[in-house]
């Protein structure tokens, strides 16, 4: 008797490319999120992206609340939640690198609010996936949370991010090749559930990025495009695993 079931949650909209940052309010409207946004960011992403997003909402007559965090901690998550309880937003928009995205994702999940991911760097596949990494002391916790309802990645902003963040994103993708092998071994030796679809997608994404390695250079939007699309694919693989 077949009794297997799964519930796969994926972003509804993924908007990537040149000068798409101003499209955030339209993307929010398209996924039917209502109410004013709480924009979660950190100091540098605030200057390069979040202020512009807040202004875009203001042009539509929507007053966004903004909270600037310094690091990804459970204390930062609580601070975002406290600000949300005071502001009563309809959604959370995370604008920044992996740390900001993770904090906003966990806070949105805890509050039951829709979350929109706006990465300013292509540093890891958490910009799309349903997991967040939050450190506590010497321990880094991997926390399950709903994936973003939408992702908006401006390749101009991402291309201008520090190069080491982009290379970290590349390493995150390429490491999937060995991660899948470990997963397959655990399946054979320990009976760990293995998803052929997720494994195949992860391996394909890693192989495609390696094949295009010569096209990835600092400061190029085309390079940011390649890496971000690969991170999206990797994040989707995590969600269907």
Residue ranges: model-predicted function:
Residues 1-91:
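ATP/NTP phosphate-donor binding region
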Residues 12, 110-207:
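A glycine/threonine-rich phosphate-anchoring loop and its flanking beta-alpha core
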Residues 18-19, 41-43, 95-97, 118-121, ...:
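Fold-independent oxyanion-binding glycine-rich loops
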Residues 23-27, 52, 79, 106, ...:
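Alpha-helical scaffold segments in soluble metabolic enzymes
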Residues 28, 32, 57, 174-182, ...:
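Structural signal for hydrophobic packing residues in well-ordered secondary-structure cores
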Residues 49-51, 103-105, 127-128, 162:
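Short glycine-/acidic-enriched loop or helix-start segments at secondary-structure transitions
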Residues 84-122:
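A short, small-residue-rich loop immediately preceding and capping a beta-strand
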Residues 195-241:
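Active-site segments that bind and position negatively charged phosphate/pyrophosphate groups
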């Amino acid at each position: 008797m077949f009794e297997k079931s799964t519930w796969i949650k994926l972003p509804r909209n993924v908007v990537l490319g040149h000068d798409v940052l101003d499209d955030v309010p339209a993307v929010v409207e398209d996924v039917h999120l209502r109410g004013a946004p709480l924009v979660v960011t950190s100091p540098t992403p605030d200057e390069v992206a979040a202020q512009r997003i807040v202004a875009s909402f203001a042009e539509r007559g929507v007053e966004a609340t903004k909270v600037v965090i310094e690091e990804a901690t459970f204390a930062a998550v609580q601070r975002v939640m406290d600000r949300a309880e005071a502001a009563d937003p309809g959604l959370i928009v995370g604008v920044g690198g992996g740390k900001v995205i993770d904090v906003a994702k966990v806070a949105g999940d805890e509050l039951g609010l829709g979350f929109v991911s706006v990465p300013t760097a292509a540093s890891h596949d958490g910009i799309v996936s349903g997991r967040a990494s939050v450190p506590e002391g010497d321990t880094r916790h991997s926390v399950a949370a709903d994936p973003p309802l939408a992702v908006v990645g401006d390749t101009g902003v991402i291309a201008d991010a520090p190069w080491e963040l982009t290379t970290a994103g590349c390493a995150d993708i390429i490491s999937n090749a060995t991660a899948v092998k470990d997963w397959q071994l655990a399946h054979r030796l320990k009976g760990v559930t293995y998803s052929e679809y997720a494994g195949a997608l992860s391996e394909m994404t890693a192989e495609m990025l390696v094949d295009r390695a010569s096209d990835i250079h600092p400061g190029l939007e085309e390079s940011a495009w390649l890496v971000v699309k690969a991170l999206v694919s990797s994040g989707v693989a995590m969600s269907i695993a």
